[in-house]
Amino acid sequence: MKHAEVPPPPEAAEAVFGPALEKAHLYARILAGAGVERGLLGPREVERLWDRHILNCAVVGELLQPGERVADIGSGAGLPGIPLALARPDVHVILIEPLLRRSEFLRETIEEIGIDCDVVRGRAEDRSVREEVGTTDVVVSRAVASLDKLTKWSSPLLRVGGRMLAIKGERADDEVQQHRRAMAALGVSEVKVERCGGQYVEPPATVVVGFQGVAKVSQSRSGRRHR
């Protein structure tokens, strides 16, 4: 795959990725090269790859528990799934992407980087995808759609007590208020906004967290990973 030069990893990257820092750096070069070449990333994003994209996704790993199965819906160039897999090698990430060229990029990328992820081509709402993936502990997404649509796609992939993590922007609180009722109707409740990685990225990653089914209270108390 084509590589391109990127700014050196910031100091925070070593703290977030640890021994996987070199793989994270390789992923950044792939995004800047093949990712831009194939239209998965805008060329203007290369200079801010680390803070805006890679680290912003990776810090969400603090909301994961060891051994969890994590589905990334609408994975695109692998964000947030690949940074999460690098930062949290103790979880298993499934990258779900409907477009052929993007799913091929994902397969080539994880093979070159050398990480244990699965790639499933299809839409999260497709029955074939649901049958292949089964139920997961966490469904994560980034800049894919509005919360009501994300809930409709995420909920069938979540086990009872599982969590939906939607990486959002500064209007996340307003969006939660707008869609809370629709999310509850689909079985996702106790919706809240978390800020992650404030010690590593500025601004912190903003994540909408929702819980699936009746086991949500006990899950919410143990869901955050302690560093």
From Swiss-Prot:
EC number: 2.1.1.-
InterPro entries assigned: rRNA_ssu_MeTfrase_G, SAM-dependent_MTases_sf
Gene3D superfamilies linked: Vaccinia Virus protein VP39
Binding site for S-adenosyl-L-methionine: 74, 79, 124-125, 142
Subcellular locations according to the entry: Cytoplasm
Record's GO cellular component terms: cytosol
Alphabetical UniProt keywords: Cytoplasm, Methyltransferase, rRNA processing, S-adenosyl-L-methionine, Transferase
Listed GO MF terms: rRNA (guanine-N7-)-methyltransferase activity
Pfam family, one: GidB
Keyword Signal: no
Xref: PANTHER family: S-ADENOSYL-L-METHIONINE-DEPENDENT METHYLTRANSFERASES SUPERFAMILY PROTEIN (PTHR31760:SF0)
Family the entry assigns: Belongs to the methyltransferase superfamily. RNA methyltransferase RsmG family.
Primary role: Specifically methylates the N7 position of guanine in position 518 of 16S rRNA.
Protein name, entry field: Ribosomal RNA small subunit methyltransferase G
Gene (name only): rsmG
